[in-house]
Amino acid sequence: IRRQRQMCIRDSYEDLQNLLEHYEDANSSSNPLANPAVIVDANHSNSGKKFEEQIRISKDVLHSCKMSADIHKLVKGLMIESYIEDGNQKVGEHCYGKSITDPCLGWEKTEKLIYELAELW
């Protein structure tokens, strides 16, 4: 049985490099990881709940992938939290298209970010 491991990382090149080294160390053991990989969550703790930080974080991750072939192979995707309108609201505020959970990028910023990321890739 090959083991799988989950870790929480931040968005920096150094954190991705440290994770890569951690996975390499694990793979040198007698029980290596089945498929070392990471999907970076650009929101939540990485953004400090500041939804617009997802834009910078996403671009930083792509930059890290361009700087290192090993990081490029390790990173399988980004998780960007978006909704129709920017931000969030409390339950009962009745603002159409705004999240009632975590703050999100609105549709327009999400669409722009996806196009920018495609150009960077």
Feature locations, PLM:
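A C-terminal functional module that forms or caps the active site or interfaces directly
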Residues: I55-S68
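Active-site beta-loop-alpha junctions enriched in small/polar residues
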Residues: N43-S47, L78-E85
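Structured alpha-helical segments in the cores of large, soluble enzyme domains
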Residues: S12-P32, C65-M67
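Conserved, mostly hydrophobic/aromatic
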Residues: V40, G106
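Short glycine/threonine-rich loop-to-helix capping motif typified by GTGT followed
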Residues: S47-S58, N88-E93
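Single conserved hydrophobic/aromatic residue that forms the stacking wall/gate
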Residues: I1-I9
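Structural preference for beta-strand elements that scaffold enzyme active sites
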Residues: A37-I39, L74-M79
